């Protein structure tokens, strides 16, 4: 059994992160001063400057958003990991008719957008 399979067996919600990785997402672990993992951040860059971002603190504490080329939030969701990832995976690509484009607000300062 691989490390990924072992982790998913212990925490089935982690399969959702594997789904994102297979959809082209990149991830960055965030640690505290002692090297302990405090959260996981993920990003997927789109042509035209759009980007989707994910922050996971725990399986019940996650947030996702999409920003446009100006860093303005056009979609966001908070909740459990599965709920947020499902939202991100079903979100139409930015170039697709019906994709969110109406600005909801500015992205939080310090968000990692490639």
Tell me what each language-model feature is.
Residues 1-46, 106-108:
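Negatively charged, low-complexity tracts enriched in Asp/Glu with abundant Ser/Thr
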Residues 14-17, 51, 86:
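Generic N-terminal initiation segments characterized by hydrophobic and/or small/turn-forming residues
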Residues 40-42, 54-56, 62-66, 90, ...:
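Generic preference for hydrophobic/aromatic residues in regular secondary structure cores
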Residues 70-114:
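Mixed-charge, Lys/Arg-enriched low-complexity segments
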Residues 18, 25-28, 69, 73, ...:
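Generic detector of bulky aromatic hydrophobic side chains
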Residues 1, 65-69, 109:
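Generic alpha-helix detector with strongest preference for long hydrophobic helices that associate
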Residues 45, 57-60, 111-112:
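Ribonuclease/tRNase effector modules and their secretory precursors
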Residues 49-78:
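Intrinsically disordered, low-complexity regulatory segments enriched in Ser/Thr/Pro
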């Amino acid at each position: 059994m691989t490390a990924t399979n072992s982790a998913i067996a212990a925490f089935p919600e982690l399969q959702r992160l594997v789904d994102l990785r297979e959809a082209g997402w990149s991830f960055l672990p965030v640690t505290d001063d002692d090297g302990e993992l405090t959260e996981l951040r993920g990003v997927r860059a789109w042509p035209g400057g759009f980007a989707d971002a994910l922050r996971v603190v725990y399986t019940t504490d996650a947030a996702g958003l999409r920003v446009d080329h100006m860093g303005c939030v056009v979609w966001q969701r908070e909740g459990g990991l599965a709920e947020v990832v499902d939202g991100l995976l079903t979100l139409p690509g930015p170039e697709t008719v019906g994709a969110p484009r109406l600005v909801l607000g500015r992205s939080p300062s310090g968000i990692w957008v490639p």
